[in-house]
Curated annotation (Swiss-Prot):
It comes from Oryza sativa subsp. japonica. It is found in: Cytoplasm; Nucleus. Overexpression of BHLH6 promotes shoot and root phosphate accumulation, and root hair growth and acid phosphatase activity under phosphate sufficiency. This is Transcription factor BHLH6. PROSITE patterns: BHLH. Belongs to the bHLH protein family.
Length: 310
């Protein structure tokens, strides 16, 4: 009878121990926190022991099972703590990498916003959209400029083609025959010779025009008067013709007069040249005679120079 009661108490303790172990295994699935006081070091060598109260009276096998369970849970906690540290370090590294990526993206957006002239909004999508539109507009302007340049080049080539095809277009039939048949060289050499011939002809025309006799100067009035001590005023009026006043000035320069001041006035188809001359021992009559002698070579036949009043 006593043996049966002792066996019943042993089975009761066995089932209580099983429930306790299952409860401890469920609790060990969660990570321990800093405030967790379920486990603490009580031995000098740093070994961990469970602070949970053990059953008051258990058999030897049940106590060994509880002790083994406590050691297993301690090992599980130590391993779980190491895995949590690795996960936290990886998460911090990912956060830093994401921050660096966003910082670089913002810097590029700021640089893009600084070069685009028209920004409608300040958000990222609007900045990128405005930049794309600006680039497309620049590309369209580039294509337009290239088309204009090509049109100008084609027009210049078309205008230069007739001159290159016929370098004798500005010459007569005789000159073209002479330069085309007696000099059957390359087209560039013929073009150079044609240009040389044209320049020679233009120079000869200029020389002929210069050698042609100039029309006579029509002197309408000559006045010489005294305005002060050793100062005379010489006034010559002539008709406005080609090189008339230039020839009068050259004639007066040959007299080597000491001119104080001079001016030329154009009035009603006439040119009037007035000089203020400084003299030493010469009166107005002598000055008039000297000026008349210098201008007599310029006047036309029948000019009233000799009948002018003084």
């Amino acid at each position: 009878m006593d043996a049966e009661m002792a066996m019943g108490e042993s089975f009761a303790y066995y089932w209580e121990t099983q429930r306790y172990l299952e409860s401890e295994e469920l609790d060990s699935m969660y990570l321990p926190t800093q405030d967790d006081s379920n486990y603490e070091s009580s031995s000098p060598d740093g070994s961990h022991s469970s602070s949970a109260p053990a059953p008051a009276a258990v058999g030897g096998d049940a106590a060994a099972a509880v002790a083994g369970s406590g050691g297993g849970m301690t090992t599980m906690m130590m391993g779980g703590g190491g895995g949590g540290g690795d996960d936290a370090g990886g998460a911090n590294k990912n956060i830093l990498m994401e921050r660096d990526r966003r910082r670089k993206l913002n810097e590029k957006l700021y640089a893009l916003r600084s070069v685009v002239p028209n920004i409608t909004k300040m958000d990222k999508a609007s900045i990128i959209k405005d930049a794309i539109e600006y680039i497309q507009r620049l590309q369209a302007e580039e294509q337009q400029m290239l088309r204009e340049v090509a049109a100008l080049e084609s027009a210049a080539a078309a205008s230069a083609a007739p001159a290159a095809a016929n370098p004798f277009a500005g010459l007569g039939a005789d000159e073209e025959h002479e330069y085309g048949h007696h000099h059957p060289s390359s087209s560039s050499e013929r073009t150079k010779k044609v240009k040389r011939a044209l320049s020679v002809s233009s120079i000869s025309d200029a020389l002929l025009a210069a050698a042609a006799p100039a029309p006579p100067v029509e002197i309408q009035e000559l006045r010489v008067s005294e305005v002060g001590d050793r100062v005379l005023v010489v006034s010559v009026t002539c008709s406005k013709r080609r090189d008339a006043m230039a020839r009068v000035c050259r004639a007066l320069e040959e007299l080597r007069l000491r001119v104080i001041t001079a001016n030329i006035t154009s009035v009603a188809g006439c040119l009037m040249h007035t000089l203020f001359v400084e003299v030493d021992h010469m009166d107005s009559v002598q000055m008039k005679q000297m000026v008349e002698a210098a201008l007599s070579q310029l006047v036309a036949t029948g000019s009233p120079l000799s009948s002018m009043s003084y």
